Swiss-Prot record:
Pyrophosphatase that catalyzes the hydrolysis of nucleoside triphosphates to their monophosphate derivatives, with a high preference for the non-canonical purine nucleotides XTP (xanthosine triphosphate), dITP (deoxyinosine triphosphate) and ITP. Seems to function as a house-cleaning enzyme that removes non-canonical purine nucleotides from the nucleotide pool, thus preventing their incorporation into DNA/RNA and avoiding chromosomal lesions. One of its GO terms (biological process) is purine nucleoside triphosphate catabolic process. PANTHER family: INOSINE TRIPHOSPHATE PYROPHOSPHATASE, INOSINE TRIPHOSPHATE PYROPHOSPHATASE/HAM1 PROTEIN. It comes from Acidobacterium capsulatum (strain ATCC 51196 / DSM 11244 / BCRC 80197 / JCM 7670 / NBRC 15755 / NCIMB 13165 / 161). Homodimer. Pfam families: Ham1p_like. The keyword Nucleotidyltransferase does not apply. This is dITP/XTP pyrophosphatase. CDD domains: HAM1 (cd00515).
Length: 203
């Protein structure tokens, strides 16, 4: 029996990633209807798992009976004490870095990361993604995925989003922003988490 998952995210890149990762299954990935009109909950969790569950349970109340998928994901850099972590999307905003700049949030986040990593020898980092599915305010499944890499000093590639241009995969000698979408989803934290999650959902 086919499943329909309503994604509680306005991030077009994430929605695309989920659809590609689920493409070989009977699962239909749809945006949550009316998401733009819903006031987002405050992400008060201190871990990716807490925030993913909080969002899934909150948004599932807006789609009675439906399965709502939420994620919390980000970048952890060892030399920065695992920052930006759960604040990855708001890294520059939290630091009041380039306020009022016409640059996008992703661009400012990447610039701040480059600044913080200037002269740092330990370049190890990892992407982490936790997915949660809830129905009627109750989490019914969750899964985590991660991928290890290195943080570059300058961006490479124009694909992807977020920190992808700085996230280097040594085994491919490319950044996440330089690989095709199929390869990215095969290797990425988000693709790994979704594959585990789909196996855990009730048929």
């Amino acid at each position: 029996m086919a499943l329909t998952l309503y994604v509680a995210s306005s991030n077009a890149g994430k929605l695309r990633d989920f659809r590609v990762a689920a493409g070989h299954t009977a699962t239909e990935i749809l945006p949550l209807p009316g998401l733009a009109e819903i006031d987002a909950p405050e992400e008060t969790g201190t871990t990716f798992a807490e925030n993913a569950r909080l969002k899934a349970e909150f948004y599932s109340r807006c789609r009675p009976g439906g399965l709502v998928l939420a994620d919390d994901s980000g970048l952890e850099v060892r030399a920065l004490g695992l920052l930006p972590g759960v604040r990855s999307a708001r890294f520059a905003e939290d630091a009041e870095y380039l306020p009022g700049s016409p640059l996008s949030a992703d661009e400012r986040n990447n610039l701040l990361l480059m600044d913080r990593m200037r002269g740092v020898e330990d370049r190890a980092g990892r992407y982490v993604c936790v997915l949660s599915v809830a129905r009627d305010g109750v989490e019914i499944a969750s899964a985590e995925g991660e991928v290890a890499g290195e943080i570059l000093g300058v961006p490479q590639g124009t694909g992807g989003f977020g920190y992808d241009p700085l996230f280097y995969l040594p085994e491919l000698e490319k950044t996440m922003a330089e690989i095709d979408l199929e390869t990215k989803l095969r290797l990425s934290h988000r693709g790994a988490a979704l594959r585990v999650l789909l196996a855990r959902l009730p048929g």
